[in-house]
């Protein structure tokens, strides 16, 4: 086996790359992906240009770091370009700020509930508001929406 790796080192690198990529598909957290890609590229280069084992190891290490760095740069650019509303993906209340609704039930002492889609949200206002009042969500505190009356 060792003789085969010495005579045909590209087979070792291509096999290692395939194993790392297969393990990445099983695990799926990204740690082995770039090492697998670097091993495949190293195998292809060694197949075309015979290199000593020292240079093969250096090339593998550099390609792994380069691939991971390029992925990090691409991913950080994508995160920066993400729409602002996506940053509140798990904060539904934040998405409601600025939206307008009609109260179905009156607010007593400035407190009550308002239907938003298929859910009911606790609301508070600076004044009592009657049913049928057009309101706008101006802020959220915890799960309570702060609203104000607006003209329709």
From Swiss-Prot:
It is a multi-pass membrane protein. It is found in: Cell inner membrane. Residues 53-54 are periplasmic. The chain crosses the membrane at residues 1-21, 32-52, 55-75. Residues 22-31, 76-152 are cytoplasmic. InterPro entries: Membrane_assoc_protease (IPR052165), NA-bd_OB-fold (IPR012340), NfeD-like_C (IPR002810). The keyword Isomerase does not apply. Gene3D superfamilies: Nucleic acid-binding proteins. It holds the Pfam family NfeD. The keyword Membrane applies. GO terms for cellular component: plasma membrane. Keywords: Cell inner membrane, Cell membrane, Membrane, Transmembrane, Transmembrane helix. Its main location: membrane. To M.jannaschii MJ0826. This is Inner membrane protein YbbJ.
């Amino acid at each position: 086996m060792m003789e085969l790796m010495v005579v045909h080192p590209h087979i070792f690198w291509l096999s290692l790359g395939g194993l790392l990529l297969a393990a990445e598909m099983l695990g799926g957290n990204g740690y082995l992906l770039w090492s697998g890609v670097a091993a495949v590229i190293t195998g292809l280069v060694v197949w075309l240009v015979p290199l000593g084992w020292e240079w093969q190891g250096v090339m593998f290490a550099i390609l792994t770091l380069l691939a991971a760095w390029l992925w990090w740069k691409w991913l950080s650019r994508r995160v920066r370009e993400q729409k602002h509303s996506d940053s509140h993906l798990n904060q539904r209340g934040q998405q409601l700020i600025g939206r307008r609704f009609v109260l179905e039930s009156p607010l007593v002492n400035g407190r009550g509930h308002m239907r938003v889609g298929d859910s009911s949200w606790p609301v508070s206002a600076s004044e009592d508001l009657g049913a049928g009042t057009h309101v706008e969500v101006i802020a959220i505190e915890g799960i309570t929406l702060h609203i104000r009356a607006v003209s329709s």
